[in-house]
């Protein structure tokens, strides 16, 4: 029996855990949210075994030398000078390299989420290729920028300078957020890029494709490489006389049949969630609005729901649909190979220790639980800094991933058990969290040290409770799976007694 169970799990993992890189990103302006906060959601998708670790990088003084990707077994041989005085910052990083921090804040309250893998036109990459050997990639962006950037705009400017001088090692989109502004950065080719400030009363969604259209030189709402428009004109991907206003996506971004089934549907689905009256077809990706005012103000819960989406309730549902012809046509947001997803929330009116919070779900969001990780945290419970690409009994990543792998052997039967338990946990946690934050603010005004102690006690208790629940659910699902396997093997025995 044990052999059949393991074989089933391995086969399912092979099917669901492909190596394709993909992410989905959502940004929400403060006047588009229900409480005046700025919100960022992103899924990080690659390999299901890509265990993550939670890191707190201490402030550093009088540094010399270089940051080296190669020294950490990173993507290439990118190097960059270390800042003389580096700020404290956090990342959720690759367990193997301790690089590729998916999300984090620094002590100045500036946050970053990256990257969104995007693709440029082949004809332009032949002229201005990615610098794959020594250009900057998602492996190094957080560890270069977070210790030194004091605002979102400064982060955009610095990354742009690096792309223009050292080159991008790949195509990417990056989110920058601070107390006042929310920016999205996209590469075009190896040395071309633009960035746009997100309108306060609108939201933006992207899925593995360049999505920024407008770009205006000398406009404070935009930044970009100095010759980004001229390069497109010179290489005949933009003709002002014929095309009218410059469109960065149209000029620089790959757009073909792959995007129709892989990328467009995710953008369309999120926009339909937040703007139900909007009527558009999955295939009309180039017509989707870039920025939209939501029909109702958006919350953290709305973004969690988007990160968990898989065309729920339709024939295209990747996991629950009975229509085998339509079930896997379109790529869902929540996929098994997601190794983490997060929702960043910035509330400038609160002390930054709790005003900057990231809700993180490890593994597949649809079968995981979102926990709040405050910027004021000084540590984690055991297992958060452990992990590798091999399953173990210590890593917090594998606590969640083991349960998800079991559930995917029979999603229809086992997923309701997990989803109902996690929904109940999150609902109860929201009540506890509101009470904690109220207590924290009152205590912060009198005694910051005691307030920070309260923050860490609450956070670590939450981590432990979620871990305990997950282990209970793993045992419950494993018991169900064992009983199912027993029944299956007995039926194969044609009613004969063992």
Stretches found by the model and what they are:
Residues 23-138, 158-285, 289, 294-295:
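A contiguous strand-loop segment
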């Amino acid at each position: 029996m044990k052999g059949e169970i393991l074989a089933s799990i391995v086969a399912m993992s092979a099917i669901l855990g492909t190596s394709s890189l993909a992410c989905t990103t959502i940004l929400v302006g403060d006047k588009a949210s229900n409480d005046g906060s700025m919100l960022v959601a992103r899924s990080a998708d690659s390999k299901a075994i890509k265990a993550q670790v939670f890191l707190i990088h201490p402030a550093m003084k009088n540094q010399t030398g270089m940051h080296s990707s190669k020294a950490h077994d990173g993507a290439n041989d990118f190097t960059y000078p270390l800042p003389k005085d580096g700020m404290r910052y956090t990342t959720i990083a690759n367990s193997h390299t301790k690089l590729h921090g998916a999300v984090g804040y620094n002590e100045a309250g500036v946050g970053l989420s990256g990257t969104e893998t995007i693709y440029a036109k082949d004809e332009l990459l032949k002229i201005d290729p990615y610098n794959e050997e020594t250009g900057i990639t998602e492996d190094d962006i957080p560890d270069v920028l977070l210790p030194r950037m004091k605002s979102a705009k400064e982060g955009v400017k610095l990354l742009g300078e690096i792309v223009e001088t050292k080159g991008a090692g790949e195509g990417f989109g990056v989110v920058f957020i601070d107390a006042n502004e929310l920016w999205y950065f996209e590469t075009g080719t190896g040395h071309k890029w633009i960035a746009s400030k997100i309108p306060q009363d609108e939201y933006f969604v992207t899925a593995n494709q360049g999505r920024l259209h407008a770009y205006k030189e000398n406009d404070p709402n935009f930044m970009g490489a100095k010759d980004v428009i001229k390069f497109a004109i010179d290489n005949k991907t933009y003709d002002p006389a014929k095309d009218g206003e410059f469109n960065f996506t149209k000029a620089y971004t790959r757009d073909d049949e792959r995007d129709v089934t892989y990328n467009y549907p995710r953008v369309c689905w999120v926009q339909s969630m937040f703007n139900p009256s909007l009527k558009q077809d999955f295939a009309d990706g180039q017509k989707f609005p870039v920025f939209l005012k939501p029909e109702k103000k958006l919350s953290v819960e709305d973004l969690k729901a988007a990160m968990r989406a898989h065309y729920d309730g339709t024939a295209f549902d990747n996991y629950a649909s009975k229509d085998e012809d339509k079930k896997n046509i379109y790529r869902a947001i929540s996929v098994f190979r997601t190794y983490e997803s997060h929702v960043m929330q910035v509330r400038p009116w609160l002390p930054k220790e709790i005003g900057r919070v990231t809700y993180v779900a490890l593994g597949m969001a649809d079968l995981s639980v979102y926990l709040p990780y405050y910027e004021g945290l000084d540590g984690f419970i055991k297992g958060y800094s452990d992990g590798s690409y091999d399953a173990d009994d210590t890593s917090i990543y594998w606590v969640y991933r083991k349960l998800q792998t079991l559930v995917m052997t029979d999603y229809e039967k086992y997923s309701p058990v997990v989803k109902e338990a996690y929904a109940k946990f999150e609902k109860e946690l929201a009540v506890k969290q509101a009470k904690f934050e109220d207590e924290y603010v009152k205590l912060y005004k009198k005694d910051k040290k005691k307030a920070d102690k309260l923050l860490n006690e609450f956070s670590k208790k939450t981590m432990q409770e979620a871990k305990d629940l997950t282990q209970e659910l793993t045992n419950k699902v494993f018991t169900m799976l064992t009983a199912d396997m027993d029944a299956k093997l007995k039926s194969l025995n044609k009613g004969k007694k063992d």
